[in-house]
Amino acid sequence: MIVVTSFVRNSAVAAVASTPWNVRLRELAYQSLFSESISLYRSMLRSGSSPDAFSFPFILKSCASLSLPVSGQQLHCHVTKGGCETEPFVLTALISMYCKCGLVADARKVFEENPQSSQLSVCYNALISGYTANSKVTDAAYMFRRMKETGVSVDSVTMLGLVPLCTVPEYLWLGRSLHGQCVKGGLDSEVAVLNSFITMYMKCGSVEAGRRLFDEMPVKGLITWNAVISGYSQNGLAYDVLELYEQMKSSGVCPDPFTLVSVLSSCAHLGAKKIGHEVGKLVESNGFVPNVFVSNASISMYARCGNLAKARAVFDIMPVKSLVSWTAMIGCYGMHGMGEIGLMLFDDMIKRGIRPDGAVFVMVLSACSHSGLTDKGLELFRAMKREYKLEPGPEHYSCLVDLLGRAGRLDEAMEFIESMPVEPDGAVWGALLGACKIHKNVDMAELAFAKVIEFEPNNIGYYVLMSNIYSDSKNQEGIWRIRVMMRERAFRKKPGYSYVEHKGRVHLFLAGDRSHEQTEEVHRMLDELETSVMELAGNMDCDRGEEVSSTTREHSERLAIAFGILNSIPGTEILVIKNLRVCEDCHVFLKQVSKIVDRQFVVRDASRFHYFKDGVCSCKDYW
C-alpha cells in the first residue's frame, strides 16, 4: 500500500486545520483500524491540510502495525519536509515503525542521526524494544549499557523492553542482573515489571524464583496470577496449576481465557475430569466458547479425560474452527482407537476446503496406526506429497514405520527405512524398535537399538525397551549387557506413576510406593484381585503368575485401579492416567479384573486410551 505520491507543505493555517484530522487519526489508531487510518491520511493531504507532529505518530503506528515499510519510508520523508524530525514522539514513532517492519538498521540510523535521541529515554526505549522484538540480543544489551553510561534515566519501559530477551535459560544470568538493577533503582514496585520478571523466571525453568516473587507482591492482579499459572503449566506442574487456580478464585480474581487454557491443559494432563467439567461449565456460562484457544483446550481436556462425546460436542458448536481445532479432534479419535471416525472427519475437513498441513497428517497417520488401518495410512502418506504438495518430515516417516511395524510388516518397514530420501533419525529407529517389541523380533530389534542410540544415546526409554525385548526372549545375557550400558551412563529408570481422581482430588500412585494414606487398604484390595485373577485363570500358568507377582504386582496402574474400586460405587467407570506405556502383564491383569468386578476401566497411557470391559480391551491387544 502506498500512502501518497506527493506531499505539499502548506501554511500555518493549513496546520491549524489539521487538528480535526488528528482527532480522527487518533481514534482510528486506538481502535486498531489501521487501514482506515492510512486512507484518512491520504484524504487529509488531498484536502490541503498539512500533517504535524501530532499527526505523524498515529499514521506511523498504522504503517508499523500493517508492516508497510515502503509507506513508512514515504512518511519519513513527510516528517523531514514538515520539520518534525526532532519531535520526541515523532522520533520514537519512526524508530518503532522501522523496527516493527524488520528494518532495524534504519531505526538505528534514525536514532544516530538525531542528536536529541541520545538524550531521551523514550528513544532508547523504542530502539531497545525493537531490538528485543527482532531477537537482537547483543544490540539491545549495548544500547542499554550506552543508556546508563550517558546518564539517561532507566525506567520501567526500559525494563519491559529488555526482560523478554531473557526468557530462555542461556540469558537467565542477564535477567537476574536486570532484576537486581530494578531493585536497586526502585523499579521493583512496578507491577508490570514484576509480572515480566515472573514470566522470565518461569520460562527459564526457575519456578521457585518466579513463585517467590509472586508471593512477595502485596497486590496481585489477573495478569500476575496468569503469569504464575501459565508458568506452572509450561513446566508441567499440573498439580500446582489447579492449586493456584483455587487460590485465585478464593481471592476474588476472575479468570480470563488465558487462565482457562492453562487450567484446562492441566486437567487434561492429570485426567481431572470433575475439575475439568466444572471449568468447562465456566467456559460456557462466561461466553468463552467463541474463543478458539479456549475451545481447543476444552476439546483436548474432554478427550484426554475420556469424554470423547463432549469433546466432539465442543468441536461441533465452535463458530469458527481453526486448523488446530480440526487437528486436535482428529488426534483425539486416533488416541481413542477410533481411527475410522478420525478419517471421516479428515475427509469432511477437505470437503470444506480446508487445506491440511504437516501436523494434520501426523494425526491422521497416527490414527491409522492405532486402528490397524495400514493400507489407508499408506495411501494417505502417498497423497500427502502427490495431492497436497507437502514434503514429509521425520515425524511422518516415523509414523509410517510405526504403521507398518504395528501391523507386523517389519520387513516392509525396514525396506521403507532403507529407501527414505533423508537419513532416518532416532524417532524412525525408535518406532521400529517398538514394533520389534510387539512382534518379538530380537534380531531386527538389535539393529534398530544400535541405530537409535547413535541419535539419542541418553534416552533411557530405548534401553529399557531393549531390555524388555531380551526379557521376553529369556535372553539373560542381553539383559545384563543393557544393564551394564545403563550403569556406565549412570541411568536411572524413569519411575512409573498413575493418577486417579476421587471427589475432585487427584491422587498420585508411584510404582512400589506405600506413602498413600490408604496404602494398606489398597494393597489388601490388590491381593484379593490377584487371587481372583489366579482363580479365573485356573492356575494354568503358575510360573508366569510367580513372575508377575514379583515384578509387576505393584505397578502404579494396579494401585490406582485398586484405589478406584475401593472408593467408588460398584459399576461406575474408573479413569486412570499413566505416564508410561502399560506393560503386557498389567494389560492382561486389567482385562481380567474388569470381568471380575464388572466395571469399565479407562486407562490413558503414553501410547493411547485403553477401554477394559468384560475381559477385553478396546485396543484389541494392539498398542
Swiss-Prot record:
Positions of region (Type E(+) motif): 504-535
Xref: Pfam families: DYW_deaminase, E_motif, PPR, PPR_2
Annotated PROSITE patterns: PPR
One of the protein's GO biological processes: mRNA processing
Region (Type E motif): 428-503
Record key words, sorted: Mitochondrion, mRNA processing, Repeat, Transit peptide
Keyword DNA-binding: no
Protein location: Mitochondrion
Region (Type DYW motif), start-end ranges: 536-623
Keyword Mitochondrion listed: yes
Molecular function in Gene Ontology: RNA binding; zinc ion binding
Cited InterPro entries: DYW_dom (IPR032867), E_motif (IPR046848), Pentatricopeptide_rpt (IPR002885), PPR_At4g14850-like_plant (IPR046960), TPR-like_helical_dom_sf (IPR011990)
GO cellular component, as recorded: mitochondrion
PPR repeat residues: 17-51, 52-86, 87-117, 120-154, 155-189, 190-220, 221-255, 256-290, 291-321, 322-356, 357-387, 393-423
Residues of the transit peptide: 1-35
Protein purpose: Involved in C-to-U editing of mitochondrial RNA. Required specifically for editing the mitochondrial NAD2 transcript.
The protein's assembly and partners: Interacts with MORF8/RIP1.
PANTHER family: PENTATRICOPEPTIDE REPEAT-CONTAINING PROTEIN (PTHR47926:SF503)
Family: Belongs to the PPR family. PCMP-H subfamily.
NCBIfam families in UniProt: PPR
Name of the protein in question: Putative pentatricopeptide repeat-containing protein At3g11460, mitochondrial
Source organism of this protein record: Arabidopsis thaliana (Mouse-ear cress)
